[in-house]
Design a protein with these regions (language model features):
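Signature of N-terminal electron-transfer/Fe-S-associated modules in redox systems
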Residues: 1-144, 276
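FAD-binding core/adjacent interface of flavoenzyme oxidoreductases
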Residues: 53-57, 93-167, 187, 218, ...
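N-terminal Rossmann-like FAD-binding beta1-loop-alpha1 element of flavoenzymes
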Residues: 160-192
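Residue-level detector of alpha-helix initiation sites
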Residues: 168, 172-174, 199, 291-293
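Short glycine/serine/threonine-rich phosphate/pyrophosphate-binding segments
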Residues: 174-180, 203, 306-309
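Glycine-rich FAD pyrophosphate-binding loop
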Residues: 185-205
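Glycine-rich phosphate-binding loops of nucleotide-dependent enzymes
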Residues: 201, 205, 210, 286
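Short beta-strand to alpha-helix junction loop
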Residues: 210-224
Length: 317
């Protein structure tokens, strides 16, 4: 089900896309994530829990999503354990759940034994026994994760060395404001702005449907950043779909930027890098990473259609 389109929607309803999930064809639009497209197609279940085999739905809308792990594409472009909430939809996408929620639940047969199987029981029960080599593969197959790739990766990867005065990690309101403050306060300082999402704005984008002030502020701030880039692109670099994952001594930080899945880039001219590792040396670091909402604790809070309030607002937008 789709909501009525609004002016600030991140989804372009003029560009329909076709994709396949768990061997079934669906329709989505440019700007959708795989998760948002599946929700719009009334898909409820994406996985089963490890211990009890309970069907799981989507809880989050980004990196915080614990359930919707999928295997993307096949052959040399096969990628395991990707989160449906982080995959931007493209025409011809093909994905399957890491643990099929619609398969027969063989784990139901061992439910009466659950009281004898506390977390980590297999390490004490089997690790010193000769049977470990027999049961290990079976136990790991129940874990709900994708199979490891079995063929050579066809994609191209690259790395870049970068130097800057200020590195801002987080492209929401705080991060954009910090970058603008540095740029306006110095005529020579270089800034790199990093955000994990495809678009800047962070949680502010969740307010566009109801808060005109948020929309106006974002458009103005984005325009100022673009002006700095146009005037001197060496002073401001914006890395979207990028994760700062390591901070070493002397402010050496590694950022992994994803340009797309291998299959989504297959029609581009040349053989472009699918992922680029930015090796950044910076004088100062500003952390503007925001926070994740904690789920509420109550009985059956793992049922499908129970989401974080942040996630609901994000899918609406």
């Amino acid at each position: 089900m789709r909501l009525e389109k609004h002016a600030s929607s991140l989804v372009d309803y003029t560009q329909p896309l076709s994709f396949v999930f768990n061997n079934k064809a669906y329709k989505g639009f440019k700007g959708d994530t795989l998760a948002s497209a599946l929700i719009a197609n009334d898909v409820l279940y994406y996985a089963r829990s490890f211990k009890y085999g309970r069907k799981r739905g989507i809880i989050g809308a980004g990196v915080e999503e614990p359930n919707a792990l999928v295997s993307l594409e096949i052959g040399g472009r096969y990628t395991p354990n990707m989160k449906a909430t982080e995959i931007m939809l493209y025409d011809g996408l093909s994905a399957v759940s890491s643990s099929n929620p619609h398969s027969i639940d063989f784990r139901a047969m061992i439910k009466p034994l659950h009281r004898f199987m506390p977390a980590g029981f297999y390490y004490k029960t089997f690790i010193k026994q000769k049977v470990w080599s027999i049961v290990e593969d079976r136990l790991r197959s129940l874990s709900g994760f994708s199979k490891a790739p079995s063929v050579t990766d066809e994609d191209v990867y690259d790395h870049i060395f970068q130097h800057t005065e200020v590195l801002v990690i987080g492209g929401g309101v705080a991060g954009m404001s910090a970058a603008l403050e540095v740029l306006s306060g110095s005529k020579v300082a270089r800034v790199i702005l990093v955000d994990e999402r495809e678009n800047l704005g962070g949680e502010l984008t969740n307010e566009f449907t109801t808060d005109q002030t948020a929309t106006l502020w974002f458009q103005e701030a984005k325009g100022k950043l673009q002006k700095y880039r146009d005037e001197d692109n060496s002073r401001l670099k914006i890395l979207t779909s990028a994760t700062a994952y390591a901070w070493y001594d002397h402010n050496y930080i590694e950022v992994l930027q994803t340009y797309g899945t291998g299959q989504s880039m297959i029609h581009e001219s040349g053989q472009n890098a699918r992922k680029v590792l930015h090796k950044i040396r910076t004088k100062e670091v500003i952390l503007a990473t925001g926070a994740h909402e904690r789920p509420m604790l109550f009985e059956t809070n793992d049922l499908a259609n129970i989401m974080l309030s942040q996630s609901v607002r994000r899918y609406i937008n």
